[in-house]
């Protein structure tokens, strides 16, 4: 049984690596943001008495869609030979998007949000554009 588990984990890692490329800091942070957004959404919905399995399923579907788009972006980078430029731009876009959602969830619970976190949204958003501009230059 232990061998089957190890083979399964190894297989998952291989597929994950193929789909998303190098599991670098950006990928790890995106996964953390995705999990944090889902949990903060559950907390806010529970806090407000709005928790439902339908909303939970929609949340999971959106998170899977984000990962699919990151995987597609990585595959595009492989085709174009742009070394994760497209993937990183997509990741920065979704980092900003997930951070906005996380902060909104805490505001829904009546919490104040530190300005430094609000400012990070602008930084991630700018990085998303920077990566796209870098990609455009690579194509010239």
Curated annotation (Swiss-Prot):
Family note: Belongs to the bacteriophage holin family. Cp-1 holin subfamily.
Ranges annotated as spanning the membrane: 4-21, 26-48
Entry membrane topology: Multi-pass membrane protein
Compartment annotation: Cell membrane
Protein name (Swiss-Prot/TrEMBL): Uncharacterized protein Lin0175
Domain of life: Bacteria
One term under GO cellular component: plasma membrane
Swiss-Prot/TrEMBL keywords: Cell membrane, Membrane, Transmembrane, Transmembrane helix
Pfam families linked: Phage_holin_4_1 (PF05105)
């Amino acid at each position: 049984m232990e061998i089957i588990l190890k083979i399964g984990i190894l297989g998952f890692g291989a597929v994950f690596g193929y789909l998303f490329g190098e599991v670098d800091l950006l990928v790890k942070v995106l996964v953390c943001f995705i999990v944090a957004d889902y949990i903060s959404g559950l907390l806010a919905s529970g806090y407000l008495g709005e928790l439902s399995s339908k909303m939970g399923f929609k949340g999971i579907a959106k998170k899977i869609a984000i990962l699919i788009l990151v995987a597609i972006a990585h595959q595009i980078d492989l085709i174009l030979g742009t070394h994760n430029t497209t993937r990183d731009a997509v990741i920065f876009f979704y980092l900003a998007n997930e951070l906005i959602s996380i902060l909104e969830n805490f505001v829904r619970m009546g919490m104040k949000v530190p300005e430094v976190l609000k400012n990070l949204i602008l930084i991630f958003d700018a990085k998303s554009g920077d990566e796209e501009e870098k990609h455009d230059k690579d194509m010239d």
